[in-house]
Amino acid sequence: MIHKEFRFTLIKVFPLVHALFLAFCVFLLNYQVAGPMIQGDEGGYLANAAAIAGFHNDLASSYHAGYSFLIAPAFYIFDTPQSIWLTVKVINSALYLLLVVALWWIVKRLFISISFQKQFSAVTLVSLYPMWVIMAGYSFPQIAFATFFLLTFIVFVKAFSLKNISWFFVGLITGFLYWIHPIGIVPIIAGSIAVSYLGFIHRRYSLPLFFMVSALGILILYRYGINPWLTERMTISGLKADLHYQNALRQFRFFYDYEGLISLLGHIGGHVFYITTGTLGLVWLGLLSLLQQSLNVSRNPTGLEVHEWRAISLFLGLSFLGIEAISILMFSGPLTGQRLDHWMYGRYVEGVLAPILLIGILGSRLKNLIWIIPIMVAAATLLAFTLKSYTHTAPFNISAFFQYFFLENLGVWAWLAAGCVVIVVAAFLKAPFGWAFIIVIFWLSIFFQQKYHISSSYAVERSRWVIGQFIRQNFPRGTCVGFDYISADNYNRKVYWHDLGFLLFDYKLKRLTYEQWLKSCEGPFFTFDREIGSRAAGKIYPISRNPIEGILWIRYSDFKDVSGFIDLAGDPTCFVNGCFEMSYIELASFSKVGRVTDNGLKSTGASGYLFFGPYRRVEAGDYYVEIKLEVSAAGKANFDVVSERGGKKHIDVQISDYFQAGQNVIRVPFSLDKQVTDIEVRLYISKDSALTIYSYALKINDGGVNAPGLSKSPID
């Protein structure tokens, strides 16, 4: 008796323990993510949250604020970007926890005859679908959308047995999906159709009325209440909000001609191909199971009436198909110049996948996956004959596309072959081995997605956070900071605006022209306009810069406050042109074969690049690289300065041509005939090279350094 009671208690509390364990693991997986990297998406939601918490800013946008309300407590509680970002990841992990708990509720309610072991396996499998695991490390709203869609589904099912008024509350939570993201309009429409069907069947015509009044009411509240209130808090410069969502009707302009129709077909193929291979066909098993339940031919009794299953099928099926259609229309466009993930975008529709996947796993047999292959082949064929080229890929938008990390360069047919293989293996492995195999494939995607995310976030921190960190270190909170938004004339430059928006959430960061800044802003001014210095000679001074683009200026009258941070001996011309210095500590991040010692970067007896990078922007002109080093044996040490990822060489010499015994500083001159955006200073050494690098600096050559340039200056 005691044993049975203990087992009953264990089974009752196990779902919560299971959810807590998985949520903790997800938090640990994302712990090393240094910060937001996808701007302005992540930055837009963070800026909303800061404004909600009382930090008025100038970053109003089209991004909806439902998710931002959830992460706003991070800005209430903490006062540094690092601690806020950590708290955002904690909140995301809590949302993931709710997602797993919701999956358990659905299993217990809809599949009461399934064994506990199968319930556990199914919940674990769906919980490890890559999208919600990796989204817990971003400040994208999809982790919130997926969780609240599950909660919406739960109250939808619970309302079957409650009074008519309960549908009012179903409408409220469904409407909140629109607060999280504009695609939330689709579940509202799908819910209205499903509830109307129930009302018709039961002759309870007030059901859809209750649902629609509350859903539309909360939608209108956001559109005409929350949105204007938030916009007022986020336009402190007086300029209009920077809106980016396209008018949906404009998308149809692409379908007026032959190329537009071909693009549409290709994007249909790409989207269907991704969602099929990404879920290993489980999404189609889910839709098939919904159809079977609706026709009362399912093998699994669930305790629900057929008409209730039909309402569920309408809600889930229309939500899935509607969002997929919107995604296809949004990204269909020119046949060239698009990213790969735009051809097969998954992040939107994956927000409604969880209940469909769960129903597919428990409502059908894995062997049925074999019938999914023709769908994938047809979709891949459409994609293959349309996709001629693409620019690059944002892998987090196709989080379950494991082929990206192994077979990207091999093309669609290789992706198709790999997808078919894993689906066939999953179909012919009996449970639980088939389920375990699917989990392994999901984890493979998660592992490589996390590897990409962590390394990319640290690269962003090194390359784009310099200005924001400098301002926080040298100017008090609340200081006005001007940003020359007009000079941010492309996407790559606009990301810095959102970077600063997060890093300076408690400053008065404003979109200002140079003239407006002089009149109304007491703090520094950031611009990409390199001509500012010559136009304002004698008035302003450069004090910091982004490693790649953009310079931070102050007035001469403020110079005394930050004089200790002037770069390169206070040479403003060199500073503005892009001169820089790299210490051996910094070079360690750009070394293949070096080892950091107490005072330098030392060769290790291996051949390879002792240093490379750092991919900086440098203006056209005459320069030289001054290297401080100690040479025991030069060997075959080749020094060059390149750009375009090594495609263009500006100087290529042997260190031995410039070095003489007893010297510890060499200077190598070179010229740039035009601006470069990714300059690399490289030293490739052989196995017999024995040397230590202390630092190097890129400086303007006013004619005093010629080839070969030797110096006997001591290391200082």
What are these regions (language model features)?
Residues 12, 103-128, 147, 165, ...:
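Transmembrane-helix signature of polytopic, membrane-embedded enzymes
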Residues 32-46, 58-74, 82, 459-463:
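Extracytoplasmic catalytic/substrate-binding loops of multi-pass membrane glycan-assembly enzymes
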Residues 40, 64, 131-144, 183:
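Short acidic/glycine- and proline-prone juxtamembrane loop motifs at membrane-interface regions
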